[in-house]
C-alpha cells in the first residue's frame, strides 16, 4: 500500500513539474535613459537602473542605445537594490548576456558609475 502511494505521489509531482510554466520578467518599454517598464505576466514595475548616472546631453543617444540593447519582450533578471519614490532601483541583467546593462552602459561611455 505504501509503494502505491509513493508511485502516485511521484506521478503527481512529475505532472505538476512538467505542466507548470515559469514566466520571466520582460521589457515592456524603455521610458527614459535610466527608467524601464518591466512586466512579469502578472504585474508591471517601473524600474530605475542602479548605479547609472546619465548626462542630460547624452539622453537621446542613451535612449536609442538602450532600446537596441533591450528591445521589447527581452527576458531579464532583476537584482533589486532598493526603491526611491515608489520606483524600484535594480540591476537589470538580460538572460542572453548575464552582464548587467549598467556595466554595458558605462563601457559604452554613455553613463558614469555612481555607486
Question: Which residues does each predicted region cover?
Answer:
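Small beta-barrel nucleic-acid-binding modules, primarily SNase/OB-fold domains
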Residues: 2-115
Amino acid at each position: 500500500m505504501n509503494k502505491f502511494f509513493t508511485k502516485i505521489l511521484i506521478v503527481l509531482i512529475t505532472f505538476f513539474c512538467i505542466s507548470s510554466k515559469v514566466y520571466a520578467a520582460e521589457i515592456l518599454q524603455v521610458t527614459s535613459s535610466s527608467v524601464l517598464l518591466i512586466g512579469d505576466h502578472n504585474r508591471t514595475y517601473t524600474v530605475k537602473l542602479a548605479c547609472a548616472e546619465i548626462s542630460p546631453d547624452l539622453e537621446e543617444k542613451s535612449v536609442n542605445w538602450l532600446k537596441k540593447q533591450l528591445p521589447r519582450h527581452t527576458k531579464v533578471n532583476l537584482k533589486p537594490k532598493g526603491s526611491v519614490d515608489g520606483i524600484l532601483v535594480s540591476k537589470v541583467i538580460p538572460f542572453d548576456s548575464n552582464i548587467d546593462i549598467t556595466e554595458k552602459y558605462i563601457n559604452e561611455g554613455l553613463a558614469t558609475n555612481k555607486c
